[in-house]
């Protein structure tokens, strides 16, 4: 009786690399990536947003419940997706260091800050706060943070080989510039259509 293997991609991995490096003979084991399963997976929330209509702004991306606590994820979109050039990694990295430092030291939101970091597409950042918030609730906080980044001079916090895994990939001048652009063009007089995701 023959058994048909499941659909997928097959890779032969030496067992010695998994169990015992040093075996004289290393039989292989098949590693299967099931393509059918990935085809049935639902899109994550951020992939359901129409990025063609999306403008730079401050949006609630999602809300998650962990025990009795609500975690609100904000989309701090700094550039127009697939329209403006994306930010380079050096300035993104600098904004991450400065933004995280500002938030963790904030007198009100410091203890509520779960995470601040860049989107993989390099068009903005995600901010996760403990609590149930709407976009309008954090506009002042985001303004404060980007004023801090715009005006920052000197050594970027954590930009040393001891503190960071890629400390040379920094561009403070461009981080200052992008923070000013976001403040002037988006945050200064933010409209409702930049606080709620497009339909």
Predicted regions and their residues:
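Aromatic (phenylalanine/tyrosine) cluster motif
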Residues: 10-11, 19
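His/Glu-rich zincin catalytic helix
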Residues: 17-19, 33-103
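M16/MPP (pitrilysin/insulinase) zinc-metallopeptidase core fold and M16-derived inactive scaffolds
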Residues: 81, 85-137
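Active-site-adjacent, His/Asp/Glu-enriched structural segments that form or flank metal-binding
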Residues: 116-188
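Histidine-acidic residue clusters that define the catalytic metal-binding segment
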Residues: 184-199
């Amino acid at each position: 009786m023959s058994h048909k293997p499941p659909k997928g991609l097959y890779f032969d991995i030496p067992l010695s690399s998994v169990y015992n490096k040093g075996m004289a003979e290393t039989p292989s084991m098949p590693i299967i990536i099931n393509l059918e399963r990935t085809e049935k997976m639902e899109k994550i929330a951020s992939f359901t947003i129409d990025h063609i209509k999306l403008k730079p702004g401050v949006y609630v991306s999602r809300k998650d419940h962990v025990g009795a606590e609500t975690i609100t994820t904000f989309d701090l979109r700094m550039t127009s997706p697939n329209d403006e050039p994306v930010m380079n990694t050096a300035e993104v990295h600098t904004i991450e260091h400065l933004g995280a430092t500002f938030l963790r030291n904030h007198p009100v939101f410091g203890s509520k800050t779960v995470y601040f970091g860049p989107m993989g597409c390099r068009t903005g950042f995600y901010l996760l706060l403990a609590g149930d918030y709407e976009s309008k609730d954090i506009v002042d906080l985001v303004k404060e943070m980007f004023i801090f980044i715009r005006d920052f001079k000197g050594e970027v916090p954590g930009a040393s080989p001891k503190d960071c895994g890629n400390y040379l990939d920094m561009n403070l001048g461009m981080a200052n510039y992008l923070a000013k652009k976001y403040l002037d063009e988006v945050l200064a007089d933010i409209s409702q259509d930049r606080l709620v995701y497009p339909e």
